[in-house]
Amino acid sequence: MRSVRFLAGSFLALFLVGVIVALPGAALPYWRERYGTEEGASLYFAALLLGLLLGVRLGQQERRHPLLPLALGLVGLAFLGLPFAPSYPWMAPLAFLLGLGGGGMNVHGNSLVGELYPERRVELLNRVNVAFGLGAVLTPLALGSLPYAAFLALAGLLAFVTSALVLGAPPAEKPKERPRGALWPFLLAVGLYTGLEGALATWNRVWLEALGHATALGGLLLTLYWLFLALGRLLLAGRVAKDPLRALRGLLLGVMGLLLLNFLPQTALLFPLAGFLLGPLFSTLFALVQARFGHRALGGLMYAGAAGSTLIPGLFALLPDRGIPLGLFALSLALYLLLRGAEREVVRA
């Protein structure tokens, strides 16, 4: 029963991480109306990032109790406090708490599942990460129908309930033997993956408009892209678990095919399907690093993911519109070749 309780707690913790990520975009209209211009929101994002970096660092510690329940408690307090913040500067410390708690929740929420079910690590980590997508998708929908304060009160209450569910969670396991092989190919792969995922979500809409498609259609396809990303994690988990790196390379071949079709006006509309094939990549790489290198390596994985998701989409801003599909294809090809190298590294070790 304890393992089921911890599994439920991990699922809800990752759901709340999705809420944290989606909250600024979903709440921005309310913030603009209450606080005025959007320029002050930079304080929120800076504090959130600072808290996230520290939270991931603390999450590298093997001691899961009381760190994970405390992280959830801090997030609950931040959610409850946000409606009472009179200005952006007052929101900043609450954003710091969201980042601090969210970083620890992301590391331990994932790693706990992998340790509870090591023989099904790849499959269950993919499926439990569907929770993140649900949180990110439901946040704007909920804020469209609920008052801002009511939604945050519910989110805060859920964080406290989840904190109770993970009380007494066991410490992270140390590797039974010294890790063999290089970690860097896996870190670089995660950075390229998050960069590709973010660049597709941010810039392919611009490319569709350059091809003559309506802005509204681009928004619909972007929603489908995120939906397919979650479905890929859910539906492909069992297949990927049988031979993870080989399966990921096969999925990337499909992604490259779709990104070649992305050059043409009509077939470019198929790009959301790339989300379905990309879905299992992050959780599978997380599972492989956890099994091979242990819990302390997971912080580096999270930092690599954060760097890729920030830097690579930013570099796409330097490309002309016609360079967007070429850049996306080049990223997918580089990731495919890197995974081939990682597979050879595993065989040698």
Where do the model's predicted regions map?
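Symmetry-related core transmembrane helices of the 12-TM Major Facilitator Superfamily/SLC fold
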Residues: 149-166, 324-340
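A late C-terminal transmembrane helix in Major Facilitator Superfamily
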Residues: 294-320, 328
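Cytoplasmic helix-loop-helix junction between adjacent transmembrane helices
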Residues: 96-130
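C-terminal transmembrane helical hairpin of 12-TM major facilitator-type secondary transporters
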Residues: 246-285
